[in-house]
């Protein structure tokens, strides 16, 4: 599937036409439109959805689809990992990704994940439903359709896919879109907050909790000024120190011991800022939050 590609993507894909690879090219219209076009022409029992940028580990596809031997499983998600990081900033984003993977594995043990890894997952063809044109989180909307049809969404940690490490500048708009998509999900799937959601507690704590976190932190800072003096100084001072470290991180050189602490504070702060900016989806068209991720250029 080529969604208005302007580089050599189409030509490269065409080189594999003799090996059964079929290229479907559509005018640029966003990922939902591209996926909907693909759903109209693909067949088979299992759909494998991948992005072109990531690198799949050998045997990862076999490991991924093996789980469909369980008839209760509707979606299986691979595990995204980042390649070696060059900076503390990239390392912290990689650690955040590992934490996300851990959460998904734990949710699988309970029942189901709340979505899938968009660059590498598989779904039973009969469960894949078309996307509304304004959808921000296709990798949540499509899997959750299977979830509400009574199937499980599970993680397969042995089906690994690799991506290049990213900077906070690259990650920020993507995180804004992801968190804004959580607001949008409440409109697309209002049953998420109803009794039909067998993962209700997990959705509220995992998805909605992240949206509320910056507001709770702001309330914590303000309320700290009403504490007794000895506690007020400690609580306010600790919070301001954390925000201060996040602020100065950009001016500190790599290799400085303090950088490991300030980079972590900055990463956390940027994620909180992204959660605040995500509320923009309530006031602007959702597709204005789409920004293509720039692929880092590998050095020879």
Residue ranges and their predicted role:
Residues 2-11, 27-29, 54:
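A conserved acidic beta->alpha catalytic loop
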Residues 3, 50-52, 132, 157:
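Active-site acidic Asp-centered loop
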Residues 10-14, 31-40, 143-144:
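Short, conserved alpha-helix that lines the donor NDP-sugar binding/gating region
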Residues 27-28, 32-34, 38-40, 44, ...:
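Long helical/loop segments within the catalytic core of UDP-sugar-dependent glycosyltransferases
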Residues 47:
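Short aromatic/hydrophobic "clamp" motif used to bind/position activated sugar donors
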Residues 68-100, 133-138, 142-203, 267, ...:
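Catalytic donor/gating beta->alpha subdomain of glycosyltransferases that bind UDP-sugars
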Residues 210-286:
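Membrane-embedded multi-pass helical conduit in multi-pass membrane proteins
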Residues 288-300:
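Membrane-proximal intrinsically disordered regions of secretory-pathway and membrane-system proteins
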